Curated annotation (Swiss-Prot):
EC number assigned by the record: 2.4.3.6
One Pfam entry name: Glyco_transf_52
Domain of life, per lineage: Bacteria
Catalytic function, reaction form: a beta-D-galactosyl-(1->4)-N-acetyl-beta-D-glucosaminyl derivative + CMP-N-acetyl-beta-neuraminate = an N-acetyl-alpha-neuraminyl-(2->3)-beta-D-galactosyl-(1->4)-N-acetyl-beta-D-glucosaminyl derivative + CMP + H(+)
Name listed for the protein in its UniProt record: N-acetyllactosaminide alpha-2,3-sialyltransferase
GO-annotated biological processes: lipopolysaccharide biosynthetic process
Gene (UniProt): lsgB
Keywords for the protein's UniProt record, in alphabetical order: Glycosyltransferase, Lipopolysaccharide biosynthesis, Transferase
Pathway: Bacterial outer membrane biogenesis; lipooligosaccharide biosynthesis
Active site: H223
Family: Belongs to the glycosyltransferase 52 family.
Deletion consequences: Disruption of this gene results in persistence of sialylated glycoforms of lipooligosaccharide but a reduction in sialyl-N-acetyllactosamine-containing glycoforms.
Length: 304
């Protein structure tokens, strides 16, 4: 049996495609999460659909300090399957995933993309604190792994960004959609993909109003963290992530996506019916996100 570890709805979408590539193998799926809203619950069920067995693990969003560490320490008591042939995961630096793997055995390790972080220089998913306090925490929760130890075990990486250099050299491309797209296009629709880039609700609302005045999008697809709405903006309220929303409801439309630098844009960049228009924000702390655009062959549609 193989082990599939997921932390986000996008990872479930990718995981399902990977599982399709192994039709004669059984999978045990685990969905981690601190906020179990309708979207996460839906995608946990989507993971369970393609696995012979599965479980969900609540990572305790509201727990802090020692209570949080105790919850992680108790993870070993929830593990029901101990031995696996192959393990698949995206988040090498997750303490939860590292601790889970510390209490099971496996023969081979495979990874897959955690959004566009895999193709940018100095990705967060390879970062791990080296402090004494962090080492004490790992010892307390029973985590025997590190990013470096796991990275050295990677046999292959599955990527939805085959045209870009990945942090893992041995890659196998996968597609999130049916490559035989031949629907007749009937109209055009545009979206702005929400990203709360500022610290306060008021600042983010002001940014959306500014976008509305300067960018001609039809609909706004909110980020899960955006628990506010702006009058006059046409929001898409869906339990699906945007990629799935496109595949299920807009297969016969040309889609224009406006975005700052959302992973959604990179996930759909090569889709034949999708046009990506990157918007450069003037917010100082996010300028580094645009530094790699020339190397990635990306251009800015508009600056605001």
């Amino acid at each position: 049996m193989n082990l599939m570890l997921c932390c986000t709805p996008l990872q479930v979408l990718i995981a399902r495609k990977i599982i399709e590539l192994h039709p004669n193998e059984q999978f045990f799926g685990v969905m981690f999460g601190g906020v179990w809203d309708k979207k996460r619950t839906l995608y946990a069920s989507k993971l369970a659909e393609v696995c012979s067995d599965s479980m969900n693990i609540d990572t305790g969003k509201d727990l802090k300090g020692f209570d949080f560490l105790k919850l992680m320490r108790q993870l070993k008591n929830k593990i029901t399957h101990k031995g696996f042939d192959k393990v698949f995961l995206a988040n090498l630096n997750s303490l939860w995933l590292q601790t889970y793997l510390s209490h099971v055995s496996f023969k081979e390790l495979y990874t897959f993309d955690d959004g566009s972080d895999n193709i940018f220089p100095h990705p967060n998913l390879l970062r791990e604190p080296g402090t004494f306090k962090y080492k004490l925490i790992k010892a307390f929760i029973g985590d025997k792994y590190s990013v470096n130890k796991l990275f050295k075990k990677i046999k292959k990486h599955y990527t939805v960004y085959p045209n870009y250099k990945n942090i893992v050299s041995n890659i196998e491309p996968i597609s999130l959609w049916d490559n035989q797209i031949d629907c007749e296009i009937d109209g055009e629709v545009s979206f702005f993909i929400g990203q709360p880039l500022l610290n306060t609700k008021e600042e983010n609302i002001s940014l959306i109003k500014k976008l509305k005045d300067q960018i001609p999008f039809d609909y706004y697809f909110p980020h899960p963290a955006e628990d506010y709405r702006v009058d006059g903006v046409n929001y898409v309220e869906s339990e699906l992530i945007f990629e799935d929303y496109v595949f299920k409801h807009l297969s016969n439309k040309k889609i224009i996506i406006y975005t700052f630098f959302s992973s959604v844009a990179f996930n759909l960049l090569s889709h034949p019916n999708v046009e990506i228009r990157f918007i450069r924000t003037s917010i100082p702390r996010w300028q580094f996100c645009y530094d790699s655009f020339p190397d990635l062959g990306l251009t800015i549609y508009k600056e605001i």
